[in-house]
Amino acid sequence: MKIERKRLVLLSLLIFGGITAFAQKISKNVMQKIYDEVKTPYKYGMVVAPKDNYHQIDCPMVYREGNRWFMTYVVYNGKDGTDGRGYETWLATSDDLLQWKTLGRLLCYADKGWDMNQRAGYPALIDWTWNGSYEMAKYKGRHWMSYFGGEGTGYEAIRKPLNMGMASTKGDITQAHPWETSSSPVLSI
């Protein structure tokens, strides 16, 4: 047994050593150039703040349409995770990424259904290329958003599991309006 264990350890070390031998080192100059390009020179704090202590904001996603920026974000309507109903998805707009104006809801609570209390949406098909367009592309003539949905109340899956749904719209993505949501989850536990 001792010999087999020693062989296994030696083999593991040889494999690990072989893998790391081919790893490329990145110079300090290259790392500094990357840092200089992506650093945030100023800290501005929250650009969208909740209206009171009984609402929490989370999960911002930014995209561009025309010459304006848009941000979706989720709002939890509770204070401690157990007292609220759940998440809704909202939309805001900005010219400079610092001053934001809230436009309204995209995924609202529903009266019934698998996703009636949790609707945390995340826009899909955004061009994230560095210095790219940051626009949200269409698929089959619609804009899409994946979302966490659930019927349990509270923060996320505190009472019941969350599932994944898809929402879409043919409407104007620069305006707040209800998106069409899945009648059933596309991914569930």
Regions found by a protein language model. Name each.
Residues 9-10, 96:
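A residue-level detector for conformationally permissive "hinge/kink" positions
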Residues 13-22:
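Hydrophobic h-region of N-terminal signal peptides that target proteins for export
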Residues 24-121, 126-189:
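Beta-rich carbohydrate-recognition and catalytic domains
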